[in-house]
């Protein structure tokens, strides 16, 4: 008798092939049989009429703090996500000074980091004590490392400081981080020259780990930023992963075709490059990074929505232009009012700056994965992508728009992501693989989270299995606590291309 048996499912194995009706047996956290079951299960799921695929892998998450604050990870589990990649945009839980203000250091992106850990080993131990619902693999962040060594200094590092930063990066990689991330739009990373990033990304090369980047510019300077990212990866000898690829601002719409052409040229020359995208026309991030406080842009302020604002909780979920009218201020004055208040620099905003056509251009690129980029501060009104990213791709862009076939979309969310991030024995339904799976209805799966009501779980997800345990069943979170902290190993499927 098997621990778990899923019967009569349309199996999408994650490799891009058509679905095949069959059964899946699980024992001791792993898939042991795929095809026609020859036994019974202690727990059985009749998946007639449902699809089963590998659990979705969120390649761009900021869940470092969420694993400590919300170990049930309901906002990810309910959309079929079984593994996330945290530590993105240059902000990671480690390395860390436990006495420092982690919220201030990340500008609110990581929320609070509880515990006395200082390195990846300690962080993983702290998370596992809380019995997380899903799996996590970590990047080590440039902004975090730089802040720990140099504070917010607007200058190049000294030789001693560089060696110290390199050691922090190496320590994290030795403990199992999957790569080095940068967020060059954010402070203090924005103060770095290209060579500094090369010198740090180079530490990932002996581990065959990744360099992931929130590029220096995603608007007017997008193409130059892509060139810089490719240069950094070439010079440091590592795989480049471009985060949340987009062209922000109406004047830049359509540029993604040119930036993707640059990526394709690099691929043709043998450089390893992958990307991810979120399926929304609005982004979200630290509001202070988008404005010149001395002269805030009224045009940008016009499209800003407040997601999380410790200084003015009553503003959360509202458009800044409406707040400005209410308090009798111009838009530039309202920007200063929010950002210059105590803790105002921790404000997270939503910006409506992306073209729908560009999202579709991104999604059809064969090396494009899906990353939510959700910022999990549930006290505010977060971007709906935190709850809806993966069902939105399958419901809107696959079923309604027909941009991708269902098997290909699943491949992007599973085996491609697992291979890219070195997640050994995950991302494919086959005997011997870890039993991370999602059972969903391809005819009804869709996001329900909106900007006005973002904390809504999607429709069409039936069951989610994490390391062989049923963690979510028909709308119920089962507190299985079966998530693992994953250590990087290149390459999951025995090759490197």
PLM feature spans:
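Active-site microenvironment of metallo-dependent hydrolases
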Residues: 1-22, 26-27, 292-497
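Histidine-rich, glycine-flanked metal-binding segment
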Residues: 1-55, 70
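Metal-associated gating/positioning segment near the N- to mid-region
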Residues: 47-115
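Hydrophobic faces of well-ordered beta-strands that scaffold small-molecule active sites
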Residues: 57-61, 84-86, 136-140, 180-182, ...
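Hydrophobic, small-residue-rich alpha-helical packing segments that form membrane-like cores
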Residues: 92-96, 109-235
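Polyanionic/metal-chelating signatures
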Residues: 95-116, 123-124, 143-157, 168, ...
């Amino acid at each position: 008798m098997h621990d778990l048996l899923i019967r009569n499912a349309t199996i999408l194995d994650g490799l891009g092939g058509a679905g095949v009706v069959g059964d899946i047996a699980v024992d001791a956290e792993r898939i042991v049989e795929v095809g026609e079951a020859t036994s019974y299960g202690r727990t059985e799921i009749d998946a007639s009429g449902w699809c089963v695929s590998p659990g979705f892998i969120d390649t761009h998450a900021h869940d470092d703090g969420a694993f400590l604050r919300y170990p049930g990870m309901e906002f990810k589990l309910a959309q079929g996500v079984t593994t996330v990649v945290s530590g993105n945009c240059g902000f990671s839980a480690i390395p860390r000074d436990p006495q420092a203000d982690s919220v201030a250091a990340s500008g609110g992106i990581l929320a609070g980091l509880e515990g006395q850990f200082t390195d990846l080993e300690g962080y993983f131990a702290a998370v596992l004590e809380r019995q997380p619902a899903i799996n996590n693999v970590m990047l080590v962040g440039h902004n975090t490392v730089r802040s720990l060594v140099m504070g917010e200094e607007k200058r190049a590092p000294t030789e001693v400081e560089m060696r110290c930063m390199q050691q922090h990066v190496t320590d994290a990689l030795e403990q199992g981080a999957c790569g080095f991330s940068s967020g060059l739009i954010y402070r203090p990373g924005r103060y770095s020259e290209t060579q500094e990033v090369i010198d740090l990304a180079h530490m990932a090369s002996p581990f065959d780990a990744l360099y992931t980047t929130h590029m220096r510019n995603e608007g007017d300077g997008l193409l130059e930023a892509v060139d810089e990212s490719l240069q950094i990866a070439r010079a440091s000898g590592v795989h480049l992963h471009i985060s949340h690829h987009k062209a922000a601002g109406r004047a830049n719409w359509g540029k993604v075709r040119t930036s993707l052409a640059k990526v394709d040229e690099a691929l043709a020359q043998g450089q390893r490059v992958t990307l991810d995208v979120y399926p929304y026309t609005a982004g979200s991030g630290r509001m202070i990074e988008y404005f010149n406080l001395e002269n805030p842009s009224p045009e940008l302020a016009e499209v800003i929505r407040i997601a999380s604002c410790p200084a003015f909780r009553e503003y959360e979920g509202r458009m800044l232009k409406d707040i400005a009218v209410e308090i009798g201020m111009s838009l530039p004055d309202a920007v200063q009012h929010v950002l210059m208040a105590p803790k105002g620099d921790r404000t997270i905003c939503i910006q409506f700056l992306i073209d729908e056509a560009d999202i579709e251009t991104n999604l059809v690129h064969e090396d494009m994965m899906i990353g939510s980029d959700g910022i999990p501060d549930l006290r505010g009104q977060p971007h709906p992508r935190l709850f809806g990213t993966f069902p939105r791709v399958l419901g809107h862009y696959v079923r309604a728009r027909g941009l991708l076939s269902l098997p290909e979309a699943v491949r992007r969310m599973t085996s491609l992501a697992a291979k890219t991030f070195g997640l050994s024995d995950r991302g494919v339904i086959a005997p011997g693989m870890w039993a991370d799976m999602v059972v969903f209805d391809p005819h009804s799966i869709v996001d329900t989270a909106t900007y006005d009501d973002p904390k809504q779980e999607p429709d069409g997800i039936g069951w989610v299995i994490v390391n062989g345990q049923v963690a979510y069943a028909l709308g119920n979170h089962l507190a299985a606590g079966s998530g693992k902290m994953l250590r990087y190993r290149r390459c999951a499927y025995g090759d490197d291309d």
